[in-house]
Amino acid sequence: MTPALAAGLQVVFVLAVLAVAYVPVGDYMARVYESRRHLRVESVLYRLCRIDPHAEQTWYGYAGSVLGFSAASVLFLYALQRIQGVLPLSGDLSGVSPAVAFNTAVSFVTNTNWQSYAPETTMSNLTQPVGLAVQNFVSAAVGMAVAVALIRGFVRVSRGGEIGNFWVDLTRGSLRILLPFSFVIALILLSQGVIQSFHPGFASTGLDGNSVTNALAPVASQEAIKELGTNGGGILAANSAHPFENPTPVSNIVEILAILLIPVSLTRTFGTMVGERKQGLTLLAVMGILWGSLLAVTLAAESGRRGVAATAAGAMMEGKEVRFGIPGTALFAVSTTGTSTGAVNSAHDSLSPLGGGAVLLNMLLGEIAPGGVGTGLYGILVLALIAVFVGGLLVGRTPEYLGKKLRQREITLAALSVLVMPALVLIGTGITVILSSTTGYQGNSGDPGSPGSIHGFSEVLYAFASASNNNGSAFGGLTVTSDWFQTALGLCMLFGRFLPIIFVLALAGSLASQKKTAAGTGTLPTAGPMFTGLLTGTVVLVAALTFFPALALGPIAEALQ
């Protein structure tokens, strides 16, 4: 079988499974969030927490609940890491240092899962499931809740601007969607050889004759939600390149499907809830065009034979697992950076300049191809409003989307939401590269314009793009254990997560308080090929105008050498 045929078959299989799951999963999630019935276990939780599940919240009440819950989660996870040495199942591990504990707590609560530590030698078998795995569920559920709140903003007509109840949305997303889906995925991964154990580990002798300690952990259960919730943080440092996490080509495809399942299906949920399923298909088409284009670029770049080693191997195999090959590696890399997952089955730092630039651009587009769980949907909806506004200017009409007028307030909130990530990425990268104290942490450096300095800049740009987009993947040549990186990247994760959430919820409240207007002859149609092209162009144009200078100094310059 030729590499091209292998790549084509894997892509076709992934798309076929997603197509089969699209309608049932999307409609199921719509029923979950629209249902008036509460499961018995949900009712018990509401009573224990003194929550009125029938009480509606305005946007600021909803935002306050999101921020309060997330702040409590950060404090709990930070404390758990600091005292893990005196807790059961800690083995020989001590408490985590303050800087790493802060960075990790912020990372997992924001759905970033940036890991500046070796998990198997830092986190205990209690901290992993009780602290980190729990956040894998609830941080994903928070993103889905915000997306659903924005959908309600388009659907509802309420003078008070109520957009739902955060606590109900959080509970339903966790118990009715993420938990059962994760259980099924975990069983499939177990069948492929992914480990599930609370044993501290075992010793073995390597080929060089030295003794090696192999860490064991409850991997399968966390691996499932790691991918399904677009979290990405692995129990093992090698992440999904490790055979304990991702042992076979079949498990690799299962993990890719888990990454894409909910973000793709949420477009169907959106179309179902607003009563116009073509609207969801239009958003899905934009996501598919961007995802497919970057996948083609990455496959072509990594299948090339640049250099003696690549020519001998038949492709750019450095940093890649032979059991996955170029197709499985490229498919995973584009899927994990097009969502907020950040899991890796290869060393992204070893990707070719063009391939590394493609996965970096995937994040800089705003992670909307197809985006993280919930975050991808509300991210592309915000960009859709920008596209409608631009289209309205072209035809001289008041912009409308789904019967709601886009006034100055709505456009301002949409623009602010879009601008948060670029500001964090460019400011963080700029400050880092001019600080002399950070150069020692760059594995690649040198005189200005040299290959080392160019790739070193790409590593810094990638780190801040990953943190600000709540992705979590990294170019491994950059050492991020210093207090500067722990703090700066931690702040980027916080602001990159919660500022857009605040703006999106404010937008949802503003839309919900409006009356619906009937579409007229001058209304821009927002379903179909024309709007698909307009929205795709808007996404690319915003990213190009914002990041082209930075990309020209990094991946583009490196590719041209």
Swiss-Prot record:
The system is composed of three essential subunits: KdpA, KdpB and KdpC. This is Potassium-transporting ATPase potassium-binding subunit. It is found in: Cell membrane. GO terms for cellular component: plasma membrane. Part of the high-affinity ATP-driven potassium transport (or Kdp) system, which catalyzes the hydrolysis of ATP coupled with the electrogenic transport of potassium into the cytoplasm. This subunit binds the extracellular potassium ions and delivers the ions to the membrane domain of KdpB through an intramembrane tunnel. Belongs to the KdpA family. Keywords: Cell membrane, Ion transport, Membrane, Potassium, Potassium transport, Transmembrane, Transmembrane helix, Transport. The chain crosses the membrane at residues 5-25, 60-80, 86-106, 131-151, 177-197, 247-267, 281-301, 324-344, 376-396, 415-435, 488-508, 537-557. It comes from Rhodococcus opacus (strain B4). It is a multi-pass membrane protein. GO terms for molecular function: P-type potassium transmembrane transporter activity; potassium ion binding.
